[in-house]
């Protein structure tokens, strides 16, 4: 699992936040693995599947609210 960083570059220290982030990451990983497997079984090009998912992540990141700094 990654070391989750705050906007200032310091590691997130709250264990509950880290737990939620890691759980979210694992859920997304499992969902992506299932979707890739489905696509491949249906005859889709794995490279195209990766490209589509990459664009999806880029779009989600672009739509994310700006990071807030702790005061």
Language-model region placement:
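Short acidic DE-rich linear segments
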Residues: 68-71
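Short, charge-rich amphipathic interface segments used for partner binding and complex assembly
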Residues: 34-65
């Amino acid at each position: 699992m990654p070391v989750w960083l705050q906007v200032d570059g310091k590691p997130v220290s709250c264990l509950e936040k880290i737990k939620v982030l890691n759980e979210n990451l694992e859920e997304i990983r499992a969902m992506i693995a299932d979707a890739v497997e489905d696509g491949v079984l249906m005859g889709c090009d794995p490279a195209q599947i990766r490209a589509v998912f990459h664009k999806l992540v880029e779009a989600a990141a672009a739509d994310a609210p700006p990071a807030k700094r702790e005061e």
